[in-house]
A protein has these predicted regions:
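Amphipathic alpha-helical scaffolding segments comprising HEAT/armadillo-like alpha-solenoid repeats
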Residues: 1-10, 31-43, 65-80, 101
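Structural detector for internal amphipathic alpha-helices that build alpha-solenoid repeat scaffolds
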Residues: 7, 17-31, 40, 50-66, ...
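Short, surface-exposed loop/turn motifs that are enriched in glycine and acidic residues
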Residues: 12, 24-28, 45
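Short inter-helical turns and helix N-cap capping residues of alpha-solenoid HEAT/ARM repeat scaffolds
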Residues: 13-15, 46-48, 83-85
Length: 101
């Protein structure tokens, strides 16, 4: 069930391994309705870099989403945020440019 997967991805109670698995499934089952939760996850400093990187990779597949402007806005903020790791900023930049072009 797609809704169940989305709920598990957004839940901090779910193990990171499963959250990453659900995150990868977003490439095939784009969950436009839960983009707000996904973007909140990206900006949550308590979430792991590994999970955020995986989520950015998945969001790069949302090229035709009606939520693309929101994803672009957050990716732009992340790629410019010097307090984040270089790896995370680069992934945010890749997602940003893939969606923008």
């Amino acid at each position: 069930n797609t809704r169940s997967m989305q709920k598990e991805l957004l839940s901090k109670e779910t193990s990171e391994r499963w959250r990453i698995l659900y995150c990868n499934s977003l490439k095939n089952y784009m969950a436009h309705a839960c983009v707000d939760g996904l973007l909140a996850l990206l900006t949550d400093s308590s979430e792991s870099e590994k999970l955020k990187t995986c989520l950015l990779e998945a969001l790069a597949w949302f090229t035709h989403s009606y939520r693309k402007p929101d994803i672009l806005r957050v990716c732009d903020q992340l790629r410019k945020d010097k307090s984040l790791s270089e790896n995370l900023r680069e992934e945010a930049g890749r997602t940003y440019y893939r969606l923008k072009n």
